[in-house]
Amino acid sequence: MALSKNTKLVILMAIPLITFLLPAPDGLSLIAWRLLGVYIATIVGLVLKPYGEPVILLAAIAVSGVIIGNTEGAKELVKVGNMLDGYKSGTTWLIFTAFTLSSAFVITGLGKRIAYHMIGAMGSTTLRLGYVTMFLDLLLSPATPSNTARSGGIIFPIINSVVVALGSDPEKSPKKAGRYLMMNVYMVVKTTSYIFLTAMAPNALALSLMAPILGFETTWIKWFLAASVPGLLCLFLIPLICYWVSPPELKKVDNKAIAKKGLEELGPMSFREKALSVLFVIALFGWIFSNSLHINATIVAIIVMVLCIVLSIVTWDDILKSKGAWNTLVWYGGIIGMSGLLEKSGFFKWLANTLSTILQFEGHGMMALIVILTLSVSVRYLFASGGAYVAAMVPVFATVGHVTGAPTELLALGLVFANSYGGSVTHYGGGPGPIAFGAGYNDIKSWWITGAIIAFGSLIIHLTIGMAWWKLLMSLGWL
């Protein structure tokens, strides 16, 4: 039975109240103990969703400020202003500004134009349409940090139109083409979302949360290099796996007619589309060569956002209407600030010391790594939000890995990539899932079977080929 909003709010208020009534564990400061209660309540709030993510985080920030100001000895460890530190993080603004590019692809119609050209060139069979989806998502992913916007706003409407044109009906003929293509849309986006740092907002969030624990940082291009070999291999296999589990009844497609109709509706390519194409290339160039250009990825994104406005590709009003960008700015900056409070108050250091006395993986760092990454995928059945999973579990898994001697670089990369592909296990593992599943072509059984094959298959690929590749990059000094 679904919980009422009032019941959810009572649960959220009870959690920090418990940390007020109970004494702090040995070795943990009182302020860290009380802030932990707020943090746990925040994570539970992201799962229960009595309100949207921004409201939950703003409430958590407000409560944290009150606690810091009224807890004895708190100001020796943290200051009231520290709870807002997440909003001055470069990654927070990188994600926010990258949303402008994402919106521009939808507003100008460039995303649809690219898709129809791909369909016309390669989509002569349903299997090839699966690969068209893959290539399109991969092409758009560096500039769309909301995989929900990318999948739901650009790719899903096009594939849904194709499915309808092929005569596949959710009730009468779902297996004709719709079941395969809709499942493929979701499984593809869960892999493209970790190939690029800017392909999904929780990527940067995971990095930010792990940095104080593992001391691991990376750049846009190093992230891509690390993800490229295992990620592209997994991506290539996904349309085949979906095709094998849910083979479409229709094999051949009149792709030329579909592409022609779609392009005719769009009309000739506009100046805005041409300008956006150039800016997209500039953004990729800037992110790839940011070190050589002596500018960071955030500045590149801000430059491109400003140029999009100056060239009238989008207007400031368009940016104001981008709810996803503003929502992400508020909750993302908030969760980084909350995690920073725990780090400054000594919670993660205490957690590491506590776990090191409990866990016995001395001399078996690789075994610890395998166990942690397997758990990181397995627990995704419990989470309906990638952001909630990252905030709740990534710091814990990072801490456990650190104290058990798991190799730092391998652990960090394994966790950030598993964050995305791990969400494949269910139809609610990320925002694009309910969109594709909600079209009505799929059943839960085949979806979950496919998701398990892809998620745990990706895990095996990353534990073998992926780690061999990362070790090679490390030996060359490229990671």
Curated annotation (Swiss-Prot):
Cell compartments where the protein resides: Cell inner membrane
Stored InterPro entries: CitT-rel (IPR030676), SLC13A/DASS (IPR001898)
Pfam families xrefs: Na_sulph_symp
Origin: domain of life: Bacteria
Coiled-coil blocks: none
Gene Ontology cellular component terms for the protein in this record: plasma membrane
Bilayer-spanning residue ranges: 11-31, 43-63, 90-110, 151-171, 195-215, 223-243, 274-294, 295-315, 328-348, 447-467
Entry membrane topology: Multi-pass membrane protein
UniProtKB keywords: Cell inner membrane, Cell membrane, Membrane, Transmembrane, Transmembrane helix, Transport
Molecular function GO terms recorded: transmembrane transporter activity
Main subcellular localisation: membrane
Family: Belongs to the SLC13A/DASS transporter (TC 2.A.47) family. DIT1 subfamily.
UniProt name for this protein: Uncharacterized transporter HI_0020
Source species: Haemophilus influenzae (strain ATCC 51907 / DSM 11121 / KW20 / Rd)
